[in-house]
Curated annotation (Swiss-Prot):
Belongs to the pseudouridine synthase TruB family. Type 1 subfamily. GO terms for biological process: mRNA pseudouridine synthesis; tRNA pseudouridine synthesis. HAMAP family: TruB_bact. SUPFAM superfamilies: Pseudouridine synthase, PUA domain-like. It comes from the Bacteria. The active site is at 47 (nucleophile). Responsible for synthesis of pseudouridine from uracil-55 in the psi GC loop of transfer RNAs. This is tRNA pseudouridine synthase B. One of its GO terms (molecular function) is tRNA pseudouridine(55) synthase activity. Its EC number is 5.4.99.25. It holds the Pfam family TruB_C_2. It catalyses: uridine(55) in tRNA = pseudouridine(55) in tRNA. Keywords: Isomerase, tRNA processing. It comes from Shewanella halifaxensis (strain HAW-EB4).
């Protein structure tokens, strides 16, 4: 049997605009195939119902995907009022129907309850694990698992529109915030019930909305490459953002070429202006080439935490 090709060594981050009706892993595997990448990973799953920004890390960028998983997110959500479902979204079964009857003042008061730092009990229909199994698997078997409330922060919760029984909100929140849970809880506070019928992630960290690319656009570019005998690097690679954008919020520490030799071999080095208890973004030389992240050790030196493999990208 022939050895399967391991793919290209390609490093960077693609801002995928995920379509509705597909899992995040399905979208990830499609992107990996389009780029013929040897390694790929996403930065926090979107429900099949949801659309929008799903950063896909390729190659060495996967080493920093956790920092995007931990980043703030922004969503546009439309809730259908008057109906509660077992999954808190339109993929579930309706379990309760009630009349929608509240004032704008009551809505404003209810929305204020969710702003700022609060505690949230995760939905049973989530990917959080209990004894190695995702909660949603227990939920599908009718098993309720005790969950502890977790701290979340809703930085902004903006009212967009109320058209008939459909309420649209813009939510900027911390990692681990379940929009379906906010929607369900809001519906209960309003006394009518609610569930998500549209959910779109519009931002992850500071990534620009207009840089997103859909699977359809990628497919069209691959078709163009085949038709015009172009390489993948010519048509797809320009869509990738530099891998250090995943840690752009970290302080930069620039290391000389001489010290970089020690650092890249895993050794700590002495540098000036190193912050205490903070991860930093490491660059080397006058070109300020990104090589990874590090942190001060007990001796006050810069110790590498995650370093990339320096190589020329190739088809």
């Amino acid at each position: 049997m022939a050895r399967r090709s391991r793919g290209r060594f390609i490093d960077g981050i693609l801002l995928l605009d995920k379509d509705t009706g597909m899992s995040s892993n399905f979208a990830l595997q499609r992107v990996k195939r389009f780029f013929n990448a040897n390694k790929a990973g996403h930065t926090g799953a979107l429900d099949p119902l949801a659309t929008g920004m799903l950063p896909i890390c390729l190659g060495e960028a996967t080493k920093f995907s956790q920092h995007l998983l931990d980043a703030d997110k922004r969503y546009l959500v439309t809730a259908k009022l008057g109906q509660r479902t077992d999954t808190s979204d339109s993929d579930g079964e309706i379990v309760q129907t009630r009349e929608v009857n509240f004032t704008q003042e009551q809505l404003d008061t209810a929305l204020e309850h969710f702003r700022g730092e609060t505690m949230q009990v995760p939905s049973m229909y989530s990917a959080l694990k209990h004894k190695g199994q995702p909660l949603y698997k227990y939920a599908r078997e009718g098993i309720e698992v005790p969950r502890e409330a977790r701290p979340i922060n809703v930085f902004e919760l903006n009212f967009i529109s109320l058209e008939g029984d459909e309420l649209t909100l813009d939510i900027h929140c911390s990692k681990g915030t379940y929009i379906r849970t906010i929607t369900d809880d809001l519906g209960e506070m309003l006394g009518c019930g609610a569930h998500v019928i549209m959910l779109r992630r519009t931002q992850v960290a500071g990534y620009p909305y207009d840089k997103m690319v859909s699977l359809k656009q990628l497919e069209e570019l691959v078709t163009k490459a085949d038709a015009e005998s172009l390489s993948l690097s010519e048509v797809l690679d320009p869509l990738l953002l530099p891998m250090d954008t995943a840690v752009s919020g970290f302080k930069e520490i620039n290391v000389s070429d001489e010290l970089a030799t020690y650092l890249m071999n895993g050794n700590p080095v002495q540098v000036a202006n190193l912050p205490v208890d903070e991860l930093v973004r490491i660059t080397i030389g006058d070109a300020r080439q990104f090589v990874g992240i590090g942190q001060m050790n007990d001796d006050g030196q810069l110790a590498p935490k995650r370093l990339i493999v320096l190589r020329e990208q190739q088809d």
